[in-house]
């Protein structure tokens, strides 16, 4: 698995002005919170938020979006709360993480209902902050 130093070095290729201390803190938090979790493939879950945040960096997204990519599943999948997220990483990151969580949270009876609601949620997310949708799309790649 990739080390924090390797990850941060790769991010610098995309934007040398990223605050690597903040991104590094998000890396550490995501690693700690997802420790022991596995993907269906059996790989450590933590490789997923790393991949999401790398996609976001390749797209030229800002630092808050990179941090949101690293932390996009922590409130939904761990004991970490939105209040903790705000305290540790600020309101902007919380809004992004909460938006990504809400985009994937409703289940439907039919495929058509699900598709219509997903479109509605995507358009709503775009109207609030397009970065929410970009994180969600990177999450699906």
Regions from the PLM with identified roles:
Residues 1-141:
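Active-site helical microenvironments for divalent-metal-assisted chemistry
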